[in-house]
Amino acid sequence: RAGDLGEKAKREVARFAFKHPFAQSMVSLIRAMVPYQDGDVAEQKNKYQDPVENSKAIKSLSYFLGAEITGICEIPEYAWFSHYMDGEELVPYHRYAVVMLIDQGYETMEGASGDDFISGAQSMRAYMRGAQIAGIMGEMLRSFGLSSRSQTNADSDVLHTPVTLLAGLGELSRIGEVILNPFIGPRLKTVVLTTDMPLEVDKAVDFGLQKFCSSCLKCARECPCDSISWGKKIMFNGYEMWKPD
Protein backbone atom coordinates (compact mmCIF):
# COMPACT_ATOMS: atom_id res chain seq x y z
CA ARG A 1 0.00 0.00 0.00
CA ALA A 2 2.92 2.33 0.64
CA GLY A 3 4.84 1.13 -2.41
CA ASP A 4 3.10 3.47 -4.83
CA LEU A 5 4.45 6.43 -2.84
CA GLY A 6 8.09 5.46 -3.38
CA GLU A 7 10.96 3.99 -1.39
CA LYS A 8 11.05 6.76 1.22
CA ALA A 9 7.40 6.20 2.11
CA LYS A 10 8.03 2.47 2.44
CA ARG A 11 10.87 3.16 4.88
CA GLU A 12 9.13 5.84 6.91
CA VAL A 13 5.66 4.31 7.21
CA ALA A 14 6.63 2.41 10.36
CA ARG A 15 8.04 5.50 12.10
CA PHE A 16 5.48 7.59 13.94
CA ALA A 17 5.87 10.09 16.77
CA PHE A 18 3.75 8.93 19.71
CA LYS A 19 5.01 11.82 21.88
CA HIS A 20 4.95 9.91 25.18
CA PRO A 21 5.77 6.43 26.56
CA PHE A 22 2.12 6.17 27.67
CA ALA A 23 0.94 6.25 24.05
CA GLN A 24 3.72 3.94 22.88
CA SER A 25 2.74 1.40 25.54
CA MET A 26 -0.77 1.21 24.11
CA VAL A 27 0.58 0.87 20.57
CA SER A 28 2.49 -2.23 21.65
CA LEU A 29 -0.74 -3.81 22.89
CA ILE A 30 -2.63 -2.83 19.73
CA ARG A 31 0.00 -4.52 17.57
CA ALA A 32 0.01 -7.57 19.83
CA MET A 33 -3.69 -8.06 19.06
CA VAL A 34 -3.18 -8.20 15.27
CA PRO A 35 -2.87 -12.04 15.17
CA TYR A 36 -6.31 -12.25 16.80
CA GLN A 37 -8.04 -10.09 14.17
CA ASP A 38 -8.70 -13.20 12.08
CA GLY A 39 -8.83 -16.93 12.66
CA ASP A 40 -10.34 -20.25 11.78
CA VAL A 41 -14.08 -20.39 11.21
CA ALA A 42 -15.97 -23.15 13.01
CA GLU A 43 -17.18 -25.92 10.72
CA GLN A 44 -20.64 -25.99 12.25
CA LYS A 45 -23.34 -24.59 9.99
CA ASN A 46 -24.47 -21.25 11.35
CA LYS A 47 -28.17 -20.73 12.03
CA TYR A 48 -28.19 -16.94 12.14
CA GLN A 49 -29.85 -15.96 8.85
CA ASP A 50 -32.24 -13.15 9.87
CA PRO A 51 -30.60 -9.83 8.83
CA VAL A 52 -32.79 -7.70 11.09
CA GLU A 53 -32.24 -9.77 14.23
CA ASN A 54 -28.54 -10.17 13.43
CA SER A 55 -28.11 -6.40 13.14
CA LYS A 56 -29.89 -5.76 16.44
CA ALA A 57 -27.74 -8.36 18.17
CA ILE A 58 -24.40 -7.21 16.74
CA LYS A 59 -25.12 -3.56 17.57
CA SER A 60 -26.20 -4.46 21.11
CA LEU A 61 -22.99 -6.42 21.59
CA SER A 62 -20.89 -3.51 20.32
CA TYR A 63 -22.52 -1.15 22.83
CA PHE A 64 -22.07 -3.63 25.67
CA LEU A 65 -18.36 -3.84 24.83
CA GLY A 66 -17.94 -0.05 24.74
CA ALA A 67 -18.59 1.31 21.24
CA GLU A 68 -20.21 4.75 21.19
CA ILE A 69 -22.24 4.50 17.95
CA THR A 70 -22.47 1.61 15.48
CA GLY A 71 -23.64 1.47 11.87
CA ILE A 72 -23.72 -1.19 9.15
CA CYS A 73 -23.18 -1.04 5.39
CA GLU A 74 -22.36 -3.20 2.41
CA ILE A 75 -18.71 -2.81 1.41
CA PRO A 76 -18.24 -1.37 -2.09
CA GLU A 77 -15.28 -2.65 -4.06
CA TYR A 78 -13.53 0.73 -3.92
CA ALA A 79 -13.45 0.57 -0.11
CA TRP A 80 -11.05 -2.39 -0.19
CA PHE A 81 -7.32 -1.86 -0.56
CA SER A 82 -6.09 -3.20 -3.88
CA HIS A 83 -2.96 -4.92 -2.50
CA TYR A 84 -1.41 -6.18 0.71
CA MET A 85 1.78 -4.58 2.04
CA ASP A 86 3.90 -7.24 0.34
CA GLY A 87 2.40 -6.41 -3.06
CA GLU A 88 0.07 -9.39 -3.29
CA GLU A 89 -3.32 -8.57 -4.79
CA LEU A 90 -6.13 -8.27 -2.26
CA VAL A 91 -9.40 -9.89 -3.30
CA PRO A 92 -12.45 -8.63 -1.35
CA TYR A 93 -13.67 -11.39 0.95
CA HIS A 94 -16.63 -10.08 2.99
CA ARG A 95 -19.93 -8.40 2.10
CA TYR A 96 -20.74 -6.32 5.18
CA ALA A 97 -18.97 -3.84 7.44
CA VAL A 98 -19.98 -3.21 11.04
CA VAL A 99 -18.51 0.24 11.70
CA MET A 100 -18.03 1.42 15.28
CA LEU A 101 -17.13 4.84 16.62
CA ILE A 102 -14.98 5.10 19.74
CA ASP A 103 -15.33 8.39 21.62
CA GLN A 104 -11.94 9.86 22.51
CA GLY A 105 -13.48 11.81 25.40
CA TYR A 106 -14.82 15.37 25.50
CA GLU A 107 -12.82 16.50 28.53
CA THR A 108 -9.59 15.08 27.14
CA MET A 109 -10.15 16.56 23.70
CA GLU A 110 -11.10 19.93 25.18
CA GLY A 111 -7.91 20.01 27.24
CA ALA A 112 -5.52 19.03 24.45
CA SER A 113 -3.68 21.53 22.28
CA GLY A 114 -2.29 19.08 19.74
CA ASP A 115 1.26 19.84 20.85
CA ASP A 116 0.99 17.97 24.15
CA PHE A 117 1.41 14.25 24.77
CA ILE A 118 -2.27 13.56 25.44
CA SER A 119 -3.28 14.22 21.82
CA GLY A 120 -1.45 11.08 20.74
CA ALA A 121 -2.39 9.10 23.84
CA GLN A 122 -6.13 9.71 23.47
CA SER A 123 -5.94 8.45 19.89
CA MET A 124 -4.09 5.29 20.88
CA ARG A 125 -6.48 4.67 23.78
CA ALA A 126 -9.43 4.76 21.36
CA TYR A 127 -7.65 2.54 18.84
CA MET A 128 -6.78 0.06 21.59
CA ARG A 129 -10.38 -0.10 22.78
CA GLY A 130 -11.62 -0.49 19.22
CA ALA A 131 -9.21 -3.35 18.50
CA GLN A 132 -10.41 -5.14 21.61
CA ILE A 133 -14.11 -4.64 20.83
CA ALA A 134 -13.95 -5.73 17.18
CA GLY A 135 -11.55 -8.55 18.01
CA ILE A 136 -13.95 -10.06 20.54
CA MET A 137 -16.89 -9.71 18.16
CA GLY A 138 -15.00 -11.33 15.30
CA GLU A 139 -13.88 -14.25 17.46
CA MET A 140 -17.44 -14.85 18.60
CA LEU A 141 -18.87 -14.81 15.06
CA ARG A 142 -16.19 -17.21 13.81
CA SER A 143 -17.12 -19.61 16.62
CA PHE A 144 -20.67 -19.55 15.20
CA GLY A 145 -19.39 -20.54 11.75
CA LEU A 146 -19.51 -16.99 10.36
CA SER A 147 -16.46 -15.65 8.54
CA SER A 148 -15.40 -12.35 10.15
CA ARG A 149 -12.30 -10.17 10.55
CA SER A 150 -11.62 -7.08 12.63
CA GLN A 151 -10.05 -4.18 10.71
CA THR A 152 -8.01 -1.97 13.04
CA ASN A 153 -5.59 0.93 12.77
CA ALA A 154 -2.74 -1.58 13.05
CA ASP A 155 -3.88 -3.80 10.18
CA SER A 156 -6.88 -3.09 7.96
CA ASP A 157 -7.83 -4.36 4.52
CA VAL A 158 -10.57 -1.75 4.12
CA LEU A 159 -10.58 2.03 4.02
CA HIS A 160 -12.51 3.26 7.03
CA THR A 161 -13.71 6.61 5.67
CA PRO A 162 -16.05 5.36 2.92
CA VAL A 163 -17.65 2.63 5.04
CA THR A 164 -18.13 5.07 7.94
CA LEU A 165 -20.00 7.41 5.60
CA LEU A 166 -22.06 4.60 4.08
CA ALA A 167 -22.96 3.27 7.53
CA GLY A 168 -24.60 6.60 8.35
CA LEU A 169 -22.18 7.67 11.06
CA GLY A 170 -21.38 11.17 9.83
CA GLU A 171 -20.41 13.50 7.01
CA LEU A 172 -17.14 14.89 5.71
CA SER A 173 -16.51 18.36 7.14
CA ARG A 174 -14.38 21.42 6.42
CA ILE A 175 -11.69 19.82 8.56
CA GLY A 176 -11.01 17.69 5.49
CA GLU A 177 -10.52 13.94 5.50
CA VAL A 178 -12.23 13.75 8.88
CA ILE A 179 -15.76 12.50 9.46
CA LEU A 180 -17.90 14.56 11.81
CA ASN A 181 -20.64 12.78 13.73
CA PRO A 182 -23.74 14.77 14.77
CA PHE A 183 -23.43 13.65 18.40
CA ILE A 184 -19.70 13.45 19.17
CA GLY A 185 -18.30 15.67 16.42
CA PRO A 186 -14.84 14.73 15.12
CA ARG A 187 -13.50 13.39 18.44
CA LEU A 188 -13.76 9.79 17.28
CA LYS A 189 -11.76 6.84 16.08
CA THR A 190 -13.19 4.02 14.00
CA VAL A 191 -12.87 0.27 14.04
CA VAL A 192 -14.52 -2.04 11.52
CA LEU A 193 -15.67 -5.64 11.66
CA THR A 194 -16.13 -7.21 8.22
CA THR A 195 -18.29 -10.30 7.90
CA ASP A 196 -20.55 -12.37 5.69
CA MET A 197 -23.22 -12.70 8.37
CA PRO A 198 -26.54 -11.50 6.84
CA LEU A 199 -27.16 -7.96 8.10
CA GLU A 200 -29.63 -5.11 7.61
CA VAL A 201 -27.71 -2.07 6.38
CA ASP A 202 -28.11 1.54 7.49
CA LYS A 203 -28.38 4.57 5.21
CA ALA A 204 -25.93 7.43 4.72
CA VAL A 205 -26.87 10.50 6.76
CA ASP A 206 -27.35 14.16 5.81
CA PHE A 207 -27.75 16.42 8.85
CA GLY A 208 -26.96 19.70 7.08
CA LEU A 209 -23.23 19.74 7.71
CA GLN A 210 -22.22 20.78 4.18
CA LYS A 211 -24.28 23.97 4.42
CA PHE A 212 -23.08 24.64 7.96
CA CYS A 213 -19.41 24.16 7.10
CA SER A 214 -19.77 26.49 4.12
CA SER A 215 -20.39 29.43 6.44
CA CYS A 216 -19.04 28.62 9.92
CA LEU A 217 -15.24 28.74 9.34
CA LYS A 218 -14.46 28.41 13.07
CA CYS A 219 -12.18 25.40 12.58
CA ALA A 220 -10.20 27.23 9.88
CA ARG A 221 -9.90 30.31 12.10
CA GLU A 222 -8.75 28.35 15.15
CA CYS A 223 -6.40 25.90 13.40
CA PRO A 224 -2.92 26.62 14.87
CA CYS A 225 -1.05 25.53 11.73
CA ASP A 226 -3.50 27.06 9.23
CA SER A 227 -3.97 23.73 7.46
CA ILE A 228 -7.78 23.89 7.19
CA SER A 229 -9.13 25.49 4.03
CA TRP A 230 -10.90 28.87 4.11
CA GLY A 231 -12.17 28.43 0.57
CA LYS A 232 -14.77 26.41 -1.25
CA LYS A 233 -14.71 22.69 -1.90
CA ILE A 234 -12.47 21.32 -4.61
CA MET A 235 -12.49 18.13 -6.66
CA PHE A 236 -9.80 15.75 -5.38
CA ASN A 237 -9.42 12.24 -6.79
CA GLY A 238 -12.95 12.46 -8.13
CA TYR A 239 -14.50 13.58 -4.83
CA GLU A 240 -15.81 17.01 -3.86
CA MET A 241 -14.35 18.02 -0.51
CA TRP A 242 -12.51 20.62 1.51
CA LYS A 243 -8.86 19.60 1.17
CA PRO A 244 -6.55 20.20 4.15
CA ASP A 245 -3.00 21.35 3.51
What is the predicted function of each stretch?
Residues K59, E68-D245:
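Catalytic cores of enzyme domains
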Residues R1-I69:
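Iron-sulfur (Fe-S) cluster-binding modules
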